[in-house]
Amino acid sequence: MLRRALEEKYALKIGEIRTTTAVICSISTDTILDFEKQCLKPHCTFSKPIINLGYTYYDIPSEYKEELNESIAVNHRIDAYALITTFDETPIESIEPLISNDKSEIKWTFLLDWTELHQGTWLRFLSKQFESLESKGYDLKNENISVWCMNSDYMFELQKNDILWESFHFEYLQQSLRSVLFYRNGSLIYVDKKRNQLPLFEIFVKLCLHNRNDKYKSLNQFTEMSETSQVFIPFNSDSEDLIKTIDEEFQPEEVLKPDFMPTFEKVIPYSKPKDEPHLPPIGELPHFDMNKELEEAAIILKQASKKEAYAKQNI
């Protein structure tokens, strides 16, 4: 009788595994490895990537099951997939056959990295990922997305060693990210590996599980907005007025306009990656067309000659 009652209550058979799918997307393998090291438990390591795909899982312990109002007899697991993306799209097709959840239930984690991808491209990168996934029927507006900015401690190095970066730029960047996520009902996290005091793994788990129970619809106990490099702003906790407290002249609704992104890209200074990329193997060197290069050089010289002749005529 007890077994039948539990099965009816939870719409599952005892021993059946209830899964939540989380997809962690990044343009860089190194950033995914940083996320694994900084934000996951030691035993939650991604399997050796097959091409651009990694996998790990986490079985929910009993204390979480009690909060979720689930029977301890019900097995609950987070299936986490690490996916290397291109700049323009998320190749979700590689894991679609493995996903058991409805498209509207998948939890999306997008990784940005202060030491990798140029910060001025962040909004365009996110926009392209969102568009790519939404065109395939995935829901990225229903508390299902979070953006994790890894290695945010690098901000201090930029501020100290790069004369182009000023406090305004860091504030403008954060306000822009917060605004994008505010209108999508998403969450923002800055991960400072040197100073971090946020319970990153717990945040990740609860972001994955929040829609199982109303208790998970409030992560405000972890909210952190005051620290420059340690930020956690969960969905439903931000507002236009809060975003404007950083700089009241910033208008959050501007991020919804087509001309905001070009403005953002002009405002944010270029900063080269912390580690210069290695030269590609000889077999992967880009094609060099000598004739094309000579033709382009000839055009440039011809234009320069014309300008010089014109200048002499007008002396």
From Swiss-Prot:
Keywords: Cytoplasm, Cytoskeleton, Dynein, Microtubule, Motor protein. It is found in: Cytoplasm, Cytoskeleton. Its main location: cytoplasm. It comes from the Eukaryota. The keyword GTP-binding does not apply. GO terms for cellular component: cytoplasm; dynein complex; microtubule. The cytoplasmic dynein is composed of at least two heavy chains and a number of intermediate and light chains. Component of the cytoplasmic dynein which acts as a motor for the intracellular retrograde motility of vesicles and organelles along microtubules. May play an important role in the proper orientation of the mitotic spindle into the budding daughter cell yeast. Probably required for normal progression of the cell cycle. Belongs to the dynein light intermediate chain DYN3 family. This is Cytoplasmic dynein intermediate light chain DYN3.
